[in-house]
Amino acid sequence: MTVIDGKALGVKLQAALAEKTARLKEEKGLVPGLVVILVGENPASQVYVRNKERSALAAGFKSEVVRVPDTISESDLLDLIERYNQDDEWHGILVQLPLPAHISEEKVLLAIDPDKDVDGFHPTNMGKFWSGHPVMIPSTPAGIMEMFKEYQIELEGKSALVIGRSNIVGKPMAQLLLDADATVTIAHSRTKNLPDLARQADILVVAIGRGHFVTKEFVKLGAVVIDVGMNRDENGKLIGDVKYDEVSEVASYITPVPGGVGPMTITMLMEQTYEACVRSAK
């Protein structure tokens, strides 16, 4: 069994990104700029934002975190986003989710300039992605594909099951696997006979948001298991959707939590910010 080390791969890719960024600054005078808007004081969101800021600075980017209270009005938040849309120094705009109940997530995502939507959630970018002309790709699935590439995991002709159907992970993950010539099934919490279905998969991507949902009985011998889950157990410990200790006994490759998919998500956000900066100069 091989542990897929997303943390180490992220460090490797971000070192290469820092070199590209230095060359871009030297040759074209361009510095990628990433702004992250944090609404309120959600502890988990603050950790994610801090990690994004740290990665942006390590890559040589211009980085800013804008913290606003959770009492901010929807219109004021939209005005703030528009200010960064109009500022050419910023190439990536992220609004950290979740948002307070009085603010429409859909309106906020629509407000971000598609050219600066490095999360890849704007309908314009989603449409380009689904039609086979991707510009911004949701970063978690993109990071998982980089893992497959780094570890030389063959996808062509393989049976892949994605457990989870969100627009952020499940659906785009399935599309990327299809594009790599895997045969793909999407399952979810209401799928019948899910363990039986899962045991047929060569590649298992789990993004269902339930701690230790996938046990050994879901996994056939030699399967590749990618755990996207980020949950807390009763002791506050970070755990994945996969019961790592027992599934690692049967999997050929597996991602840990933490240190698996999470670091790669942030790495791909940085890559897409860099690419957005390069495109802005054309």
Curated annotation (Swiss-Prot):
Pathway(s) annotated for this protein in UniProt: One-carbon metabolism; tetrahydrofolate interconversion
Record's catalysed reaction(s): (6R)-5,10-methylene-5,6,7,8-tetrahydrofolate + NADP(+) = (6R)-5,10-methenyltetrahydrofolate + NADPH; (6R)-5,10-methenyltetrahydrofolate + H2O = (6R)-10-formyltetrahydrofolate + H(+)
Annotated Gene Ontology cellular component terms: cytosol
CDD domains: NAD_bind_m-THF_DH_Cyclohyd
Highest taxon above the source species: Bacteria
GO terms of molecular function: methenyltetrahydrofolate cyclohydrolase activity; methylenetetrahydrofolate dehydrogenase (NADP+) activity
Binding residue positions for NADP(+): 164-166, 189
Keyword tags: Amino-acid biosynthesis, Histidine biosynthesis, Hydrolase, Methionine biosynthesis, Multifunctional enzyme, NADP, One-carbon metabolism, Oxidoreductase, Purine biosynthesis
Alphabetical list of InterPro entries matching this protein: Aminoacid_DH-like_N_sf, NAD(P)-bd_dom_sf, THF_DH/CycHdrlase, THF_DH/CycHdrlase_cat_dom, THF_DH/CycHdrlase_CS, THF_DH/CycHdrlase_NAD-bd_dom
Keyword Cytoplasm on entry: no
GO annotation terms (biological process): L-histidine biosynthetic process; methionine biosynthetic process; purine nucleotide biosynthetic process; tetrahydrofolate interconversion
EC numbers: 1.5.1.5, 3.5.4.9
Pfam families in the cross-refs: THF_DHG_CYH (PF00763), THF_DHG_CYH_C (PF02882)
Described function: Catalyzes the oxidation of 5,10-methylenetetrahydrofolate to 5,10-methenyltetrahydrofolate and then the hydrolysis of 5,10-methenyltetrahydrofolate to 10-formyltetrahydrofolate.
Complex and partners: Homodimer.
Annotated family: Belongs to the tetrahydrofolate dehydrogenase/cyclohydrolase family.
Protein name: Bifunctional protein FolD
Originating organism: Streptococcus suis (strain 05ZYH33)
Lineage of origin: Bacteria, Bacillati, Bacillota, Bacilli, Lactobacillales
